[in-house]
Amino acid sequence: MFNTHKVEIEWGGRPLTIETGKIARQADGAVLATYGETAVLATVVSAKEPKPGQDFFPLTVNYQEKTYAAGKIPGGYFKREGRPSENETLVSRLIDRPIRPLFVDGYKNDTQVVITVLQHDLENNPDILSMVAASAALTISGVPFMGPISGARVGYIDGEYVLNPNIDEMPESKLDLVVAGTSEAVLMVESEAQELPEDVMLGAVMFGHKSFQPVIDAIIKLAEVAAKEPRDFQPEDLSELEAKVLAVVENDLREAYKITEKQARYAAVDAAKAKAKEHFFPEGVEETEMLAEQFATIFTHLQAKIVRWNILDTGNRIDGRDLSTVRPIVSEVGILPRTHGSALFTRGETQAIVVATLGTGEDEQMIDALTGTYKESFMLHYNFPPYSVGETGRMGSPGRREIGHGKLAWRAIHPMLPAAEQFPYTIRAVSEITESNGSSSMATVCGTSLALMDAGVPIVRPVAGIAMGLIKEGERFAVLSDILGDEDHLGDMDFKVAGTEFGITSLQMDIKIDGITEEIMKVALEQAKGGRVHILGEMAKAISSSRAELGEFAPRIEVMNIPTDKIRDVIGSGGKVIREIVEKTGAKINIEDDGTVKIASSNGKEIEAAKKWIHSIVAEPEVGEIYEGTVVKTADFGAFVNFFGPRDGLVHISQLAADRVAKTTDVVKEGQKVWVKLMGFDERGKVRLSMKVVDQETGKEIVAEKKKEEVDAE
């Protein structure tokens, strides 16, 4: 019934298995991949024909984690998986980026890649395995995919590169780098690092590329026995038509790309396009020598060619800069004085408003991952409204691109944040992109660094980011610093590097062509370092280190520690005690399992009141000390007084006053505030209190006062 094929190799000290022919047989390609005991299923389906008029390649990658893979049941009312989590979105992008450039130019059939995590051993992260499975499924599917690719995770532990470190090893690693590519070239890099130098980062990329070669060989081996017949797809030869369009638009496009201002340049390009359309699609003529979608493809190709020719031939870029110059930078902080921290970062025609907000433990984000639930105390959200590029568009929940750019900036900033013990705040940074002409994610990195320093967050060092580009024709190449949107779109590489003056904290690379050598990457990293240091210098003109004090409107947090066996006393039955403390004092309180108590309020008096209350609950009252209390009950034999938090003690009728008392209520009433001295404990451990030895006006011990008077008289 099943015609199965299976290939198994040893990779990074664990068995990797790729198998096809048994599951999802109606898909164009389906591969079940296992690494250790983590298992994923990758499927590929591509439409037989493109939709009429389609002028782009509609590829969708969906990575989905099923909670049953880790032996869990989803939370929530419906008890089933819902919309994609942030991690699922990020892994979907991670797989999409290296496979997209490898589809044959001109292929426009609707294509969907679905990767499902079926089993998680809680040791091997499924993201790399999913990339391998997707590549294998595409390779055997028959669609025009010029792979295979593979990916690998590289760690850096004790000065050594580690291939695919398991989940428990990652906290020890100074690097979390994912690299993907073909047997010849690197196509994609995504990483977070602890201020590592350029040569270590480049070494990690090359180590990863070398390490995944056995996986590519395994996929080829599987394809040799299991691949479907390649689809009969021949890319259109548009060279003759392209030459005709070039003759009409070359001069206009060359002039348009001399205009440095973005909107004016776009208007000139649109005018050139409209002129060419009139030439090739005259009004009233039904039969034309090319289709509208062919013209659109050709025009885009010609835009790229002219920009690339100009850069390689003259060394001058669209906006007149040379290859390594960064656009003018203006940095401002404190632009929104009522927020906790704010910054406006402008670089050329790219601009971001970043606002930092400080919160308490209650504000931490609860993340329910396959590996378990954990709290995240640093959030960075990136918003890209359509007005930032002068357009109208959809507003609403963040798209994949916004989530991806936010995470890239998060990775850049995260290594420089203070430890929770030093700064016990939850931090949220929000980047609003108000203008965009390339590299808005790196503007977010710079703006976030400024806003955090403005908020008084003691980051280790300021962080800046820069986006690099590449134009390569044959042996000639040019590396571009601080690329524009057009240079990103029309170039061969998008290479984002963020870090401090001492090293890299985040690196993201997407390459659209084969043949990016180690030499080119080395040039790009060195050029990026110069640009990064320049940007840090410009940022320092606004603020160079974190403010010594938090902003006026930021909450204050004080930390105290209590014995773990007293936690239940502070919380109370059903949370009764802690709710009362919060309601009466106005402070926010968060208690950790280890007895760490964080008390937050913008009012110092509220913090002190809460601290005093909690201290009264967890501390033991001392014999001989005087305490303020409240009468909670009266009886014939005396009064019960609540003192020192939840403790009650008895003031015997003989201890109510110096004179003889006939009736308790002659001296005290329920609810009355009184001063009491702790005299000791009776044989049953009950608290014995006295009022008569304490001056009820001053709270001072009467005996002590008399002794003092006697001493003064002498």
Curated annotation (Swiss-Prot):
Q: Residue ranges of the KH domain?
A: 555-614
Q: Which reaction does it catalyse?
A: RNA(n+1) + phosphate = RNA(n) + a ribonucleoside 5'-diphosphate
Q: Where is the S1 motif domain?
A: 624-692
- Provide the alphabetized UniProt keywords: Cytoplasm, Magnesium, Metal-binding, Nucleotidyltransferase, RNA-binding, Transferase
GO molecular function (one): polyribonucleotide nucleotidyltransferase activity
Q: Give me the residues that bind Mg(2+), please.
A: 488, 494
Record PROSITE patterns? KH_TYPE_1, S1
- What Gene3D superfamilies has UniProt attached to this entry? GHMP Kinase, N-terminal domain (3.30.230.70), K Homology domain, type 1 (3.30.1370.10), Nucleic acid-binding proteins (2.40.50.140)
**Cellular location of this protein?**
Cytoplasm
Cofactor(s) this protein requires: Mg(2+)
Task: Name which cysteines form disulfide bonds.
Answer: none
One of this protein's GO BP terms?
Answer: mRNA catabolic process
Any one GO CC term of the record:
cytosol
This enzyme's EC code(s): 2.7.7.8
Q: Which family does it belong to?
A: Belongs to the polyribonucleotide nucleotidyltransferase family.
Q: What PANTHER family does the entry give?
A: POLYRIBONUCLEOTIDE NUCLEOTIDYLTRANSFERASE, POLYRIBONUCLEOTIDE NUCLEOTIDYLTRANSFERASE 1, MITOCHONDRIAL
- Biological role stated in the UniProt entry: Involved in mRNA degradation. Catalyzes the phosphorolysis of single-stranded polyribonucleotides processively in the 3'- to 5'-direction.
Q: What's the protein called, per UniProt?
A: Polyribonucleotide nucleotidyltransferase
Question: Gene that codes for this?
Answer: pnp
